[in-house]
Regions:
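Outer membrane beta-barrel
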Residues: 1-89, 109-114, 118-126
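A short secondary-structure junction signal
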Residues: 80-82, 90-95, 130, 139-141
């Protein structure tokens, strides 16, 4: 009571299809890293808790404000390239999950870059690799810049009722 209200959104962007199979979006979007960040509803992972990697290292659910190019290079081979607000880790924080910010209040003195290639040309198979880099994860508030780079690859294969996933 007596506090201002707040609305939280995961996604709010404008997307422009500037060429066949290629688009640019600007706004608030989910970062294209990991297996479940973009589709993170409970039926996309096993159990009631997310796995430790996509909970603590890849901070799913992770969204940022920025701009991103997406498209299909060839049938079944797609790309995503984004420049966006980055994580903000204060002194003593070390988990990327702790660095997520509310975009409306985000410190964005140092932008981050993310890229992903994803292969889905074979039915039932997904291969992907992502990289996310930020020159200063302290957003200029530390005594020196602390850079961070996150590499991720994964495979998901499904045949009938059998599924194999590796991250």
């Amino acid at each position: 009571e007596g506090q201002p209200g707040e609305v939280e959104l995961e996604q709010a962007y404008i997307e422009w299809d500037f060429a066949s199979q290629h688009s640019l979006k600007a706004g608030l979007f989910l970062i294209p890293v990991g297996m479940i960040n973009e589709t993170h509803e409970p039926n996309t992972f096993y159990g009631t808790e997310r796995n430790s990697v996509e909970k603590n290292i890849i901070p799913a659910t992770w969204w940022e404000g920025g701009a991103a190019f997406s498209g299909e290079i060839n049938e079944g081979l797609s790309y995503d390239v984004a420049a966006h607000s980055g994580l903000f880790l204060e002194s003593g924080q070390y988990k990327p999950r702790d660095g997520r910010q509310k975009v409306g209040k985000a410190k964005a003195d140092n932008i981050a870059f993310t890229g992903r290639l994803k292969y889905t040309a074979i039915p039932g198979l997904e291969l992907a690799a992502s990289v996310q880099h930020q020159v200063d994860m302290t957003q200029g508030e530390g005594s020196e810049a602390v850079s961070g780079t996150l590499f991720e690859t994964h495979i998901a294969w499904q045949r009938d009722d059998f599924q194999l996933r590796a991250l």
